[in-house]
Amino acid sequence: MATRFRQTRRRRGHVSMGYGRIGKHRKQRGGRGNAGGQHHRKTWFTTFHPDYFGKHGMRVFHLKANKYYCPSINVDSLWSLVGKDVQAQYKNAKVGEEVPVIDCVKHGYFKVLGKGFLPKQPVIVRARYFSEKAQQKIKAVGGACELTA
C-alpha cells in the first residue's frame, strides 16, 4: 500500500521512533534466537518449553521389530469375533447366499489354525495365513478363505 509520507516523517516527535525506549534500535545484547535458555531466559524456557533441555531417552538401534509376529486364532473361536447376534442373523444362510465375513486381521489375528469345529454355517474368513486343516474345515461347511495383505 502506498503512503503519502515515509515512516520517519510520521514519527517525528516520538522520542524512540517506534524502536522502544530501552533498546533504542541498538544491537541484541540478550543474544540471538534461543540464546540464554539456561541463563537469563531460563524462566521463559521453563515456562513455555519445559522439555527443551536434557536427555530424552535413546533409540535402540540394535533391536529390530519382531518380523515373525503372527498372532493366531483357532477355527473354533472364529465366531467369537463377530458375536452371537450376527451368527443368529445368518443361521439359515445357504451356500451362494449372503454370508457373514469375519476379518481376522481387523481383530488382531494374522493366522487361522485348525483346532476345533465350526458350526455348519457358511462363512467367509479373511486372514494373512491359513493352515491346511483350517482351510479344509472352513470349506467343508461351505465357507471360503480369503488372503489379505
Curated annotation (Swiss-Prot):
Signal peptide: none annotated. Transmembrane segments: none annotated. InterPro entries: Ribosomal_uL15, Ribosomal_uL15/eL18, Ribosomal_uL15/eL18_sf, Ribosomal_uL15_CS. Gene3D superfamilies: 3.100.10.10. Belongs to the universal ribosomal protein uL15 family. It comes from the Eukaryota. It comes from Entamoeba histolytica (strain ATCC 30459 / HM-1:IMSS / ABRM). GO terms for biological process: translation. Component of the large ribosomal subunit. Residues 21-40 are annotated as: Disordered. The lineage of its organism: Eukaryota, Amoebozoa, Evosea, Archamoebae, Mastigamoebida. One of its GO terms (molecular function) is structural constituent of ribosome. GO terms for cellular component: cytosolic large ribosomal subunit; endoplasmic reticulum. Component of the large ribosomal subunit. The ribosome is a large ribonucleoprotein complex responsible for the synthesis of proteins in the cell. Keywords: Cytoplasm, Endoplasmic reticulum, Ribonucleoprotein, Ribosomal protein. It is found in: Cytoplasm, Cytosol; Cytoplasm; Endoplasmic reticulum. Disulfide bonds: none annotated. Its main location: cytoplasm. This is Large ribosomal subunit protein uL15B/uL15D.
